[in-house]
A protein has these predicted regions:
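Core catalytic lobe of class I
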Residues: 1-229, 294-296, 305, 311, ...
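PRPP-dependent phosphoribosyltransferase catalytic core
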Residues: 228-331
Length: 331
């Protein structure tokens, strides 16, 4: 499915082209009003002007969002409490999570503590909303039979590295977000075929992620140079997302029962085939380190071929076929 639409223009004007309650998910990374260079003057507003700008676009976001929809909002510390109040008190939205994006490297300070996180607000339009927990689970370090086979809820502290200027996938944009963060939002709060809106598209991370996860996506962008960057990005070869939670390839150290080990490996291989095929090698290496070389019956190529040959089978048939992919040591 390819239904990715990028629109050039001011977000407040472009919102008018979106029908009421037609969007399933909004991911918004607006200018923080810190004077960054986005190729326009929209990051240097007076305090009150910035709040009014925020109030206006948030009202539009609320209008176009379905009753089951979710908005994720990146925001700096200076204004986040004000935008929280607008969402909760003025728009009557439901706070779901205050997410902390933790990164290990940032700007250094000599008179104060160096910043190492950004904040993300997650609000739902109503108490009935989409949340696909099984698509975003993280393997535990130690497995317990009462635990879900796919792992645990990743929590509201997310560790993803910045996209540094020296990285080959860095785009000419001052606040490019890691694809892994957006991937988690899209998987958690939308389904295949749903419509995602990014009113401040920037370098096009949300559109790129939706392109790969079979979501429709609409992006607004004011700077024509970024439009070209986004188009180039969407037309480039896909070699996997540029970041992921490093815990995803973790293998529990205490899968003592053979049947549970088999099921665990099968479940995770299915997940990697769907979302992170390029990480299968790392996962298999970790399995072998913990449970021995004989833990994997099929090679990586055989696993990939199995995926290609299974596109026309039902989910139950795929599950049955994949039961033969992984074996572990006898007790």
């Amino acid at each position: 499915m390819q239904d990715i639409n990028i629109k050039l223009g001011d977000a407040l004007e472009l919102f008018k082209s979106i029908p009421d309650e037609s969007v399933d998910l909004i991911i918004a990374d607006p200018p923080y009003n810190l004077g960054k260079d986005y190729g326009n003057n929209n990051d240097t507003k007076d305090f009150d002007d910035y709040l009014e700008f925020s109030r206006n676009w948030l009202k539009e976001a609320h209008r176009v969002l379905k009753s089951t929809g979710t908005i994720y909002l990146f925001m700096g510390v200076r204004f986040i409490s004000y935008l929280y109040s607008i969402l909760e008190r003025e728009l009557n939205m439901e706070l779901n999570s205050w997410i902390t994006w933790y990164y290990t490297q940032g700007i250094g300070k000599t008179k104060g503590f160096s910043p190492r996180h950004d904040d993300i607000l997650m609000f739902n339009k109503s108490k009935k909303f989409i949340f696909n927990i099984d698509d975003i689970r993280i393997p535990q370090k130690y497995y317990r039979e009462r635990n879900n086979m796919r792992g645990a809820n990743p929590g509201n502290v997310w560790e993803f590295s910045h996209i540094h200027y020296c990285q080959k996938n860095r785009k000419p944009h001052p606040t490019q977000k890691p694809e892994g963060i957006i991937e988690r939002m899209v998987l958690a709060s939308s389904n295949k075929g749903d419509t995602v809106l990014d009113p401040f598209a920037g370098s096009g991370t949300t559109l790129r992620v939706c392109q790969q996860l079979d979501r429709k996506c609409i992006g607004f962008e004011l700077n024509p140079e970024y439009i070209q960057t986004i188009n180039d990005r969407l037309n480039s070869e896909f070699n996997g997302f540029d970041s992921l939670d490093t815990r995803i390839t973790r293998v529990p150290l205490d899968l003592r029962k053979k049947t549970i080990r088999d099921e665990y490996i099968q479940n995770h291989i299915r997940w990697f085939l769907n979302y992170h095929e390029n990480e299968i090698e790392e996962f298999i290496k970790n399995v072998k380190e913990v449970y021995g070389e004989e833990a994997m019956l099929m090679s990586i190529e055989e696993i990939k071929n199995s995926k290609e040959n299974n596109y026309d089978t039902t989910d139950d048939e795929k599950e049955e076929q994949l039961k033969f992919i992984a074996v572990t040591r006898d007790e």
